[in-house]
């Protein structure tokens, strides 16, 4: 009798995706982040579901409903902080996952990579709308500032902003629709993840060498299930340390003040994971230019397959490209730091230099470095 795992229509799909999947034997811990992102998404959907049971999306009661969750609901404080800090863990895993893709040339799988970039946009949109829901000062002013950026779009900008707001300012209609979108988007993300995996399994996984590994594949289970469980335990450990010891470490104190349209906080800034893009936005004095730079700072990831000039796929044997990659990482850290600083000297000029360097490295320096390495290979 054949195994049900290999014959049952539903279980067969799971088997081909997570059990009998042929996997390169040499993939390192950098390949753990896909499964960790799946775990993060599951944690966010579950904690979010329980939060939604007690949350009210009304401007009069939103802030107090979050307070009620933390004070009166059984383990409400735990659920709330797991959700808030779970978002941070989600983005840490996302950035490492994307960084791995860039370093090892995984972007040469066009469909998988482009769906991944769309997923990144979807997660960023979800996180932004989620930050608005507690209706604190930073929630309100963050929503006002970021949605207002759309007014830079010629001709339709102002109408578009008022349409998104559902009025002439960020108010009850805005909060209600943001809650609705924040609830539905994770399920759309989950569907996109399925498509992401579908395209990945069409080609098989990349590996650190960047070479074809068809001759050396091993089953996903038990080898990589065990490896993933280690990653899962470390992620949960990190998340729980954050939640139980310093839950407000990554938050903004201003968000513990209820939203007040008449009082602007001294420094309006988004959550830490958006600061690099926010720094790029602020470094351009023109509103439309800033918005375009902001969008392009993420959209530029889609150009990586076109900008790949090297004869080798991975950076593992390319020391010059490695050097440029780590300069890019350092530049992103610099942008993140600048995004959280006030708009004054010397932060303005540092932000502008870091922004120019960011686009220069990706569009010019890395392709040029690859061409130089190709020449060196001939020697």
Curated annotation (Swiss-Prot):
Residues binding heme b b566: 97, 196
Membrane-crossing segments per the record: 33-53, 77-98, 113-133, 178-198, 226-246, 288-308, 320-340, 347-367
The keyword Transport is annotated on this UniProt entry: yes
Gene3D superfamilies, sorted: Cytochrome Bc1 Complex, Chain C
Keyword field: Electron transport, Heme, Iron, Membrane, Metal-binding, Mitochondrion, Mitochondrion inner membrane, Respiratory chain, Transmembrane, Transmembrane helix, Transport, Ubiquinone
InterPro entries named among the record's database cross-references: Cyt_b/b6_C, Cyt_b/b6_C_sf, Cyt_b/b6_N, Cytb/b6-like_sf, Cytochrome_b, Cytochrome_b_C_euk/bac, Cytochrome_b_N_euk/bac, Di-haem_cyt_TM
GO MF terms held by the record: metal ion binding; ubiquinol-cytochrome-c reductase activity
PROSITE patterns: CYTB_CTER (PS51003), CYTB_NTER (PS51002)
Cofactor annotation: heme b
Cofactor binding summary note: Binds 2 heme b groups non-covalently.
GO cellular component, as recorded: mitochondrial inner membrane; respiratory chain complex III
Binding site for a ubiquinone: 201
Main location group: mitochondrion
Membrane topology: Multi-pass membrane protein
Cellular localization per UniProt: Mitochondrion inner membrane
Quaternary context: The cytochrome bc1 complex contains 11 subunits: 3 respiratory subunits (MT-CYB, CYC1 and UQCRFS1), 2 core proteins (UQCRC1 and UQCRC2) and 6 low-molecular weight proteins (UQCRH/QCR6, UQCRB/QCR7, UQCRQ/QCR8, UQCR10/QCR9, UQCR11/QCR10 and a cleavage product of UQCRFS1). This cytochrome bc1 complex then forms a dimer.
UniProt function note: Component of the ubiquinol-cytochrome c reductase complex (complex III or cytochrome b-c1 complex) that is part of the mitochondrial respiratory chain. The b-c1 complex mediates electron transfer from ubiquinol to cytochrome c. Contributes to the generation of a proton gradient across the mitochondrial membrane that is then used for ATP synthesis.
Family, per entry: Belongs to the cytochrome b family.
Note in the entry: Heme 1 (or BL or b562) is low-potential and absorbs at about 562 nm, and heme 2 (or BH or b566) is high-potential and absorbs at about 566 nm.
Protein name, as recorded: Cytochrome b
């Amino acid at each position: 009798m054949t195994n049900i795992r290999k014959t049952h229509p539903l279980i067969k799909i799971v088997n081909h995706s997570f059990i009998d999947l042929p996997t390169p034997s040499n993939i390192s811990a950098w390949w753990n982040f896909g499964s960790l992102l799946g775990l993060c998404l599951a944690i966010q959907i579950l904690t979010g579901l329980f939060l939604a049971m007690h949350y009210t999306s009304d401007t009069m009661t939103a802030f107090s409903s979050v307070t009620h969750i933390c004070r009166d609901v059984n383990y409400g404080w735990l659920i709330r902080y797991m959700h808030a800090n779970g978002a941070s863990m989600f983005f840490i895993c996302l950035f490492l996952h994307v960084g791995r893709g860039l370093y090892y040339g995984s972007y040469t799988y066009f469909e998988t990579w482009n769906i991944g970039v769309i997923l990144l946009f979807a997660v960023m949109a979800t996180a932004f709308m989620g930050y608005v829901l507690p209706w604190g000062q930073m929630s309100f002013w963050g929503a006002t500032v970021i949605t207002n950026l759309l007014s830079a779009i010629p001709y339709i900008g102002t109408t578009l902003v008022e349409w998104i707001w559902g009025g002439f300012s960020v108010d009850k209609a805005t909060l209600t629709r943001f809650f609705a979108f924040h609830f539905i988007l994770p399920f759309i993300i989950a569907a996109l993840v399925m498509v992401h995996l579908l395209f990945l399994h069409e080609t098989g996984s990349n590996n650190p060498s960047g070479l074809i590994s068809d001759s050396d594949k091993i089953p996903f289970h038990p080898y990589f299930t065990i490896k993933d469980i280690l990653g899962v335990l470390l992620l949960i450990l990190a998340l729980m340390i954050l939640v139980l010891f310093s839950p407000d470490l990554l938050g903004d104190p201003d968000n513990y003040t209820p939203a007040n349209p008449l009082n602007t906080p001294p420094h309006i800034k988004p959550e830490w994971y958006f600061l690099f893009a926010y720094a790029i936005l602020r470094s351009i004095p023109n509103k439309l230019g800033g918005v375009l730079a902001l969008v392009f700072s993420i959209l530029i990831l889609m150009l990586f397959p076109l900008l790949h000039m090297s004869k080798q796929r991975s950076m593992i044997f390319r020391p010059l490209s490695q050097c440029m990659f780590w300069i890019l990482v350092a530049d992103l850290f610099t942008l993140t730091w600048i995004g959280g600083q006030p708009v004054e000297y010397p932060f303005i000029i540092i932000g502008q230099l870091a922004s120019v360097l960011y686009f220069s490295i990706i569009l010019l320096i890395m392709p040029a470095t690859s061409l130089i390495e190709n020449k060196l290979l001939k020697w």
